[in-house]
Structure formats: C-alpha cells, structure tokens
Amino acid sequence: MHIVFSVDDLTESFWPVPAPAPSPGSSSTPSPTQNVADGMTRSQSEWAFHRLINELSGSDSSPTTNTIERSPPPVQSLSRLEETVDETEDVVEIQKPQNHRRLPVDDQGKNRNRAPSSDPVDSSAPVVVDPNQYHAILKSKLELACAAVARRVGTVKPEDSSASASNQKQAQGSIVAQTSPGASSVRFSPTTSTQKKPDVPARQTSISSRDDSDDDDLDGDADNGDPTDVKRARRMLSNRESARRSRRRKQEQMNEFDTQVGQLRAEHSTLINRLSDMNHKYDAAAVDNRILRADIETLRTKVKMAEETVKRVTGVNPLHWSRPNMGIPFSNTPSASSSIPPNSNHILKPANSSTNTSAGLAQNQRVETANFLPEQVNREGMQNPFAPDSNLYETLPHWNHKH
C-alpha cells in the first residue's frame, strides 16, 4: 500500500522555527556554531554569500527587509522521500528583473565563491534581494533534489540503472533558477531530458493489496509495447499466478490433513476405550477361571474321598460296578435262601422230573433274563449291604411253576 503526499505538505513540516533577521545597522555575520540548531553546516562560500545578503538587506529601507529568513533543513532519509515525491522531474525557473544580476544558485556551487566586490559592473549600484525570494530558491532546490533522489532510488529497475544515472546527470545540469523582486512563487516547467522512460511503472495511489498493485504495475508494463517488457511482465504474472495456486493447493492439503488428524484422533480415543473395556473383561475372565479351577480341584478331592470311603466300607472297588455282563452262577432250586457255592465251576442242572418241553422253555427264559440279573443284584446289594440274611438272588417266576 502506497500513499502519495504532495511536496508542499512534506517540506513545510520540515522547516525549523524561524529566527529573527539581524538588524540593518549590524554588519556582524553569524558564526557556524550559531546555526547548529538549524541543522545545516555551511561552507566558506555559503558564509560569504550570507554576508552579501546581510549587506544588501541592510541597505534596503523597504518593509521586505524585516521579513523572516529561513534556512533550509537537511535532506531527510531517502526512504521517506521515496514515498512522498512525485515521479516527474521539473526545472525551476524564477523571474528576475533585468537591472539585477543573477544569483549564483546553481547546484554545482561554482559562482558562490565569488565575492560581492569582484563584479565591476554591479559594484557601483546597490543590489536589493528579497529574503522571501532566497527562501523560494532554496525550497525549489530542495524539491528538485528530493525528486531526483526519489526517481533514482524508488522507481528505477535494476536493468535500467545506467540509463537512469545518465538521465539524472542531465537533469542536474539543466536546472536553471532565476529571481525577480515581484515574483516570489516557483514556476515549474517540464523538460524533454527529464521525461520518464516508458518501461518504469507508475506507483499506485489507491489502497489495495500488494498482489493487486503488482498486477496493475505489470499490466502497465505490458501496455507500453516493449516486447522484452511484455514477456517479462507475462512471466512475472504467470509466476505469481502459479504461486497463488500452489499456496491455495497447499492450504487445501493442510485443511484436509487437519480433518484426517481429527478423525484419527477420534478413532484413537474410541479404540483406547474399547481396549480398556476388553482389558477389564479379560481380568474378570481370568479371575473366574482361577475360581473354577479351584472348584474343580475341590470336587476332585471330594470324589476321591468318597471312593475311598465306599471301598473301605464295602470292600469292593467302585470302579468294578460299572463293568457290564458280570457272570453270576444261580441255582434252580426253589429255595430262596440258598447261598452261592464256593466252587465257581459248579454247574446247575435242571430237575429230572421236568419234561423235555418244559426244560427247553426254561433254558430260553434263563437266557432272556440273564442280562437283567446283575443290575438287580447290584441294586439290592447297594440298598442293603449290611443285611446278614439277605439273598442277592431272586428266583425266577417259572421256577415255582407246577407241573
């Protein structure tokens, strides 16, 4: 953003507080130490010129001799002058009457060393100089110097530095200042030697962004018609546009990455909660598993103790109770209280009074009921194991059949 001020607004704020002019009768000249507060250190030629002004102003009786003379302040920094001075250079011309000689105010300072008595033509007649005119001359010189510095520093491109330096020298050599008692204003007239080159961009006075102002400058360069400048401007525009696109794309990627990071953080927190729940469940299951194992060991111990008790009481191993098809001898006598013979090889035979038909039927029935006998014997033995006269065997129904 660039804001342009006028030269008058800038320079008037820089003038120091005016000091009273010396009295007409006094011929003393101020010393260099007296003007230190003015902010300017003057050479010997300037002091000679100042003495001439004092002598001329002392001989004048007009009301203009009592005016306040101002000394120009030192030139400010180039960075501030660059922002405030206009781009164009002008030549200052001040009118002067023909009966007065020209004041030595050129920028080279060659005529300042001349004494007032060195001119034989004007030594006889007194010369009257208005301090306001001298103030205007110094002010115009300051403005020209500011404009030259601003044009050289602020608006010249690197490739045109040599050409702009030559233009500055020509502009400084073409400055002419003229004075007149009746005219105290400064008149500016542009010259052809100080015109701006077409490839130098003009500064933007509107308040806008830096990119917009740069684009406008490049558009102005492209409109000038120089092929080199047009190509350079197009290349700069394309580079800036690509930079904008890359910044926009990078910003979109950063936004997308931020969104993904937020989603991943949410998923991470969810997974952490689930993991903590699973850890609690695992701990509870491990505790339950230890409890169940302890219960199983307790039950196994109880089973062993019960088996030992049964074996000690009955004298029979409980494991043999589940053995199938136990061979048990039986007697065909009708007596229910008969005991098992000690000889295991004893074979019971049927009675001789039975007929062949009844004998065959009895054999078939014994075969059919032989499988049910061990279960019944085991059940009766478990129900009353301590009965002294108990019979473990039961007579079959057909044994008591009458023939």
UniProtKB/Swiss-Prot annotation:
Motif Nuclear localization signal boundaries: 233-240
Modified residues (Phosphoserine): 213
Listed GO CC annotations: nucleus
Low complexity biased stretches: 24-33, 115-128, 161-174, 332-345
Pfam families assigned to the protein according to its UniProt record, in alphabetical order: bZIP_1, bZIP_C
Cellular localisation: Nucleus
Tissue specificity field: Expressed in roots, shoots, stems, leaves, stipulae, siliques, seeds, pollen, and flowers.
Basic motif: region residues: 231-250
Compositional bias annotation for Polar residues: 56-69, 175-195, 351-361
Domain of life: Eukaryota
Ranges annotated as spanning the membrane: none
Record-annotated bZIP domain positions: 229-292
UniProt keyword terms in alphabetical order: DNA-binding, Nucleus, Phosphoprotein, Seed storage protein, Storage protein, Transcription, Transcription regulation
Region (Leucine-zipper): 264-271
Annotated region described as Disordered, given as residue ranges: 13-128, 156-259, 332-361, 380-403
Transcription regulation keyword on record: yes
Biased composition (Acidic residues): 212-226
GO MF: DNA binding; DNA-binding transcription factor activity; nutrient reservoir activity; protein heterodimerization activity
A biological-process GO annotation: positive regulation of DNA-templated transcription
Quaternary structure and partners: Homodimer. Forms a heterodimer with BZIP1, BZIP1, BZIP2, BZIP9, BZIP11, BZIP44, BZIP53 and BZIP63. Interacts with ABI3 and forms a complex made of ABI3, BZIP53 and BZIP25.
Function: Transcription factor that binds to the 5'-ACGT-3' box, especially present in G-box-like motif (5'-CCACGTGGCC-3'), ABRE elements, of seed storage protein (SSP) encoding gene promoters (e.g. At2S and CRU3) and promotes their expression in seeds when in complex with ABI3 and BZIP53.
Family, per entry: Belongs to the bZIP family.
Protein name: Basic leucine zipper 25
Species for this entry: Arabidopsis thaliana
Taxonomic path: Eukaryota, Viridiplantae, Streptophyta, Embryophyta, Tracheophyta
Gene that this sequence comes from: BZIP25
